[in-house]
Amino acid sequence: DHLSHDVYSPRL
């Protein structure tokens, strides 16, 4: 993962 929340793999 590179972002804490992204549209490809949403980390809620």
Curated annotation (Swiss-Prot):
Tissue: Expressed in the brain, subesophageal ganglion and in the retrocerebral complex (mainly corpora allata).
Residues modified as Leucine amide: 12
Keyword hit for Zinc: no
Keyword Lipid metabolism: no
Chief subcellular location: secreted
Protein location: Secreted
CC annotations in GO: extracellular region
Domain of life: Eukaryota
Keywords on record: Amidation, Neuropeptide, Secreted
Protein task: Mediates visceral muscle contractile activity (myotropic activity).
Similarity comment text for this entry: Belongs to the pyrokinin family.
Protein name per the record: Pyrokinin-4
Organism for this UniProt entry: Periplaneta fuliginosa
Taxonomic placement: Eukaryota, Metazoa, Ecdysozoa, Arthropoda, Hexapoda
